[in-house]
Amino acid sequence: MELVEITREEVINNCEKYYENRQQFFIKTKHKEGLESAYLYQWEKYDDNFEEIKVVYCFYYDSGNSAPFDDEDIEHIYIIQ
């Protein structure tokens, strides 16, 4: 087993699969040394017109923080393969 770097696009394109499988991620952020373990968190929000609810996924870190995929603090995303 080894850590493999994946892109944000891969996460976005496969977020439902990763969420359902409880895929563990390891995230490297700008402001923290080492990797932080994370999973996908799912929540619902209304669109801009408050007419339709969208499902949104973001990273939820074991430390209790959360971040969207496009967070500028995220430098690298890894999974175990």
Where are the regions that the model predicts?
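Mixed-charge, Lys/Arg-rich low-complexity intrinsically disordered regions
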Residues: 2-17
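Acidic, low-complexity, intrinsically disordered interaction modules
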Residues: 22-78
